[in-house]
Amino acid sequence: MASQGTKRSYEQMETGGERQNATEIRASVGRMVGGIGRFYIQMCTELKLSDYEGRLIQNSITIERMVLSAFDERRNKYLEEHPSAGKDPKKTGGPIYRRRDGKWMRELILYDKEEIRRIWRQANNGEDATAGLTHLMIWHSNLNDATYQRTRALVRTGMDPRMCSLMQGSTLPRRSGAAGAAVKGVGTMVMELIRMIKRGINDRNFWRGENGRRTRIAYERMCNILKGKFQTAAQRAMMDQVRESRNPGNAEIEDLIFLARSALILRGSVAHKSCLPACVYGLAVASGYEFEREGYSLVGIDPFRLLQNSQVFSLIRPKENPAHKSQLVWMACHSAAFEDLRVSSFIRGTRVVPRGQLSTRGVQIASNENMEAMDSSTLELRSRYWAIRTRSGGNTNQQRASAGQISVQPTFSVQRNLPFERATIMAAFTGNTEGRTSDMRTEIIRMMESARPEDVSFQGRGVFELSDEKATNPIVPSFDMSNEGSYFFGDNAEEYDN
């Protein structure tokens, strides 16, 4: 994404491949998810999980977290050098839920990381299969995006909580590579940069010496990633200024916050991929599906089709609504936390409600929660239609970037208007257009003022029937223009705490 000449498709980023043709890409992505599936089956055998227990999303998440922890070299090294009480740096584990005498029991398991790595490599033809690990990270990130709010993190870096729609991928680990960078929202990149600049302000040695040089390279790389997400010349020029600053400080923080706000209307291009829980790939492999031979894509019909035929269960707390739990996981599976609810509802075929109206907490169960009253139910992850995932941000034509709602980052390439409250957004841009970026700021504000909420994004793009795998007959939905489609409207979700 960094420069025009080297655009690789998501799948190439995902599988670390150089330019490949469509068939090769489909095969390598297929190899990646097939490896995840084989690993999951092997882990279920190791843990002696019943078929039902193996389809429990909480068990899937524990197994995914174990393999991610086993390959987290930085943290493993840190744990070995700083032994903390009661933590064995060589072991990893988590809660596994089993059905005993009509009740759900929690069992804490511990495994050697070495053993987990062996099982993972064995499932992936002896390779480290980093792409598969990144894929699991993105699934966890998408789940966090749908489940938690980042108000506190936004406020801490001096940003406005209403900018939540820019925060896709904010919980992705740093080691998530190019595929991870592609799915990070503008706000996430801005926040990472601001944290870095603040450290530099507080710690004189941050930019100095041998370490400082590495820090500087990382800073410039992050600036370039963010620059690549912007689609207007003025926004990109401002990013050049931030990157080239000799000694990044408050002026750069100001510029970055300005750019983040501008992205509410002049949308950045952020990739969306449907990353599914490991148990879903496991089920498909177990039923004899050959991912590598059939090929697979994260941005087409394949994930929809997979979910159409998979039965996944979830633990449900006493007062939770199973339909709402299903919505949460459906949104996570399709990376649709920041999508317009009108579009999501149309594709899913059932109404998708704002988070403030959900009677459900997160998917993961804390270790201090009582298992006595825990129930389980089937997650409804099927959809009525499918649509192609987008990476464009939905500006109507590339140069004159158009409207974007104050809380939408489109996931699906489907025609719609992007309603937004221009007054709300423009109010944030009070006067401050002096300084070295003044001409760019003026230009950005001018573009924002000329954006019209009634403009149509993704002109002519529609959804497809699930029988239409070649995407031949687009069905262009018509939406009620007035209805605001923000998932975070009237939000009351928990904060994300690491």
Swiss-Prot record:
Record-linked InterPro entries: Flu_NP
In chain numbering, motif Unconventional nuclear localization signal lies across 1-18
Q: Where is this motif: Bipartite nuclear localization signal?
A: 198-216
Give yes or no: UniProt keyword Ribonucleoprotein.
yes
What Pfam families does the record tag this protein with?
Flu_NP
Instruction: Indicate whether RNA-binding appears among the record's keywords.
Output: yes
* Top-level taxon in the UniProt lineage: Viruses
Q: Where in the cell is it found?
A: Virion; Host nucleus
Gene Ontology molecular-function annotations: RNA binding; structural molecule activity
The Gene Ontology biological process annotation of the record reads: symbiont entry into host cell; viral penetration into host nucleus
Record key words, sorted: Capsid protein, Helical capsid protein, Host nucleus, Host-virus interaction, Ribonucleoprotein, RNA-binding, Viral nucleoprotein, Viral penetration into host nucleus, Virion, Virus entry into host cell
Q: How is it modified after translation?
A: Late in virus-infected cells, may be cleaved from a 56-kDa protein to a 53-kDa protein by a cellular caspase. This cleavage might be a marker for the onset of apoptosis in infected cells or have a specific function in virus host interaction.
Q: Enumerate the residue ranges of region (Disordered).
A: 1-21
Cellular component terms, GO, for this chain's entry? helical viral capsid; host cell; host cell nucleus; ribonucleoprotein complex; viral nucleocapsid
What this chain does, per the record? Encapsidates the negative strand viral RNA, protecting it from nucleases. The encapsidated genomic RNA is termed the ribonucleoprotein (RNP) and serves as template for transcription and replication. The RNP needs to be localized in the host nucleus to start an infectious cycle, but is too large to diffuse through the nuclear pore complex. NP comprises at least 2 nuclear localization signals that are responsible for the active RNP import into the nucleus through cellular importin alpha/beta pathway.
**Family listed:** Belongs to the influenza viruses nucleoprotein family.
How does this chain assemble? Homomultimerizes to form the nucleocapsid. May bind host exportin-1/XPO1. Binds to viral genomic RNA. Protein-RNA contacts are mediated by a combination of electrostatic interactions between positively charged residues and the phosphate backbone and planar interactions between aromatic side chains and bases.
Per its record, how is this protein called by name?
Nucleoprotein
